[in-house]
Structures are given as C-alpha cells and as structure tokens.
Amino acid sequence: MFDSKGRKIHYLRLSVTDLCNLRCRYCMPDGVDKLEREDILTYEEFLRLAALFARCGVDTVRVTGGEPLVRKGVEQLVKGLKAIPGIRKVTMTTNAVLLEQQRPALREAGLDSVNISLDTLDPALFAKITARDEFAAVQAGIHAALESGIPVKLNCVPQVGVNEGEREALAALAQDKPLQVRVIEMMPIGYG
C-alpha cells in the first residue's frame, strides 16, 4: 500500500479511547466532547482492521488514545496484534501514569516499545500542565519500562511561556538513561 506521494505505508495508528487521566491544556482542554461508547471500536474490530492492513503491507502498529492504558484489557489487544501474521512491531504512546502497574501484562503481551509524553521534569510545572499531581507515577512508569527492557522514547511538547526551558533538561536524560527524547510541535485539539 502506498500514499499519494508513492511512499510505502507500513505503519498503522489505533486510537483505542478518547479518555485520558490527565488534562493537558494543549490536548484535553475543558469542553472537549467525549465519544459515546458505541462510537468506539471494540478490540475485535481493531484486530480485524489491523489484519486487513497487515495484508496490505503494514508491519507496525502504534496503540494510542487519549490514554490507552485507561481502557480495560488493552494488553489483550497488544497480544492479539502481535499474533497477526505480518505485524512485527507493536508500540504504544502513553502518559505513563498507569504504566508501572500494567507493565508486566504489557511485557508479557509482547509490547515492543513505548513513547511517553513528558513535558517537564519539574513536578509543580507538571501538575500545572496536566492539571493532575501524577509526576511520581510517570517517573515510576518510565523506570519500570526501562527496568524491564522496554525501549522508551520521551515526547516533549514545548509551549511558549510555559515549559520552553525544559528541552535541555529532558534531552540530558538521554545521556543518563537508555532512552530517546523527541521534541514535537504542539497541535491543539478541539479549537476548531
């Protein structure tokens, strides 16, 4: 399968929920409508779609949300994706709040890597950005993933007047720990 520019498409992103346990102001501001339960695909539907895409040459699937770890049984989806012929890699984008407690099941299911959203190393600023006091849980999730050998990539979204000075501190983590840091452009959701 190829895109309109002739590039081979090998990557599928599955957004398994619109729910999140954080309220980052650039992603989940107040007033963003939630989907009705019947508007969200079941895991069986996701697996059927992934199998169809695999037959067209997709070999990598990224599980995202919202926050995918808030959806019950997400490790079963990972396991099912890994069982699809042609799917070589299953990754997840997460805020890592629930990663420490769910890491054993995800590791057993075959999760290949995680991208973790982290915009600051300052707990007070983290609480301001996310409207939640979960910095310690995120740090524990990062440590748990690294400890179990799951490759980690940190995604940092710099915001003018908020955390633009954090990029260097986050980048320094890559010198101390076996992880990568990626700075990504802010893409506001729900603003028209």
Question: Predicted regions span which residues?
Answer:
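A short acidic, helix-capping loop that chelates divalent metal ions and anchors anionic groups
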Residues: 32-36, 122-129, 190-192
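Conserved G/P- and acidic residue-centered "switch" motifs that form tight phosphate/ATP-binding loops
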Residues: 67
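Radical SAM/AdoMet-radical enzyme domain recognition
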Residues: 43-62, 71-174, 182
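Intrinsically disordered, low-complexity acidic/polar segments
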Residues: 23, 36, 101, 163-165, ...
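Ligand-binding loop in jelly-roll beta-barrel domains
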Residues: 179
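Auxiliary Fe-S-binding modules of radical SAM enzymes
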Residues: 1-11, 172, 176, 187-192
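Canonical Radical SAM [4Fe-4S] cluster-binding loop centered on the CxxxCxxC motif
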Residues: 4-44, 55-56
